[in-house]
Amino acid sequence: PRWMRPCAKGPGWPPMRSLAALMLLALPAVAEVSPNRAAELEHLVLQDCGSCHGLTMKGGLGRPLTPEALAEADRDSLALIVLDGLPGTAMPPWRPLLTEAEALWIADYLKGETP
């Protein structure tokens, strides 16, 4: 899909992404985080992600992150992008700061699917 094209850059990246996606399948269908952590993650998305993707997530330095723009994106791939960044782009990895469940919560949030 078009939204995922930057992921294909860099040798060895697609196989690693596929392996990590398989590992994410073991996590719940809806990422579970505490209400307090969910509030912290929402703040992180609006402040940190918004600094590149626009405060309304409609795009800026980074691509738009609205539910409409991510309609074709699957949550596992989005979570991997959050965790590992996009090599060769300004998108940094957040794995040192977030768990896989938190990255899935962010993916659900961006797609408008959080409980």
Task: Kindly label every feature range from the protein language model.
Residues 15-22:
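Sec-dependent signal peptide recognition
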Residues 23-31:
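Hydrophobic h-region of N-terminal signal peptides that target proteins for export
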Residues 59-60, 67-115:
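Extracytoplasmic electron-transfer domains, predominantly the class I c-type cytochrome c fold
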Residues 33-58, 77-84:
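Sequence/structural segment immediately N-terminal to covalent heme-attachment motifs in c-type
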Residues 39, 47, 63, 89-92:
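Positions in alpha-helical segments
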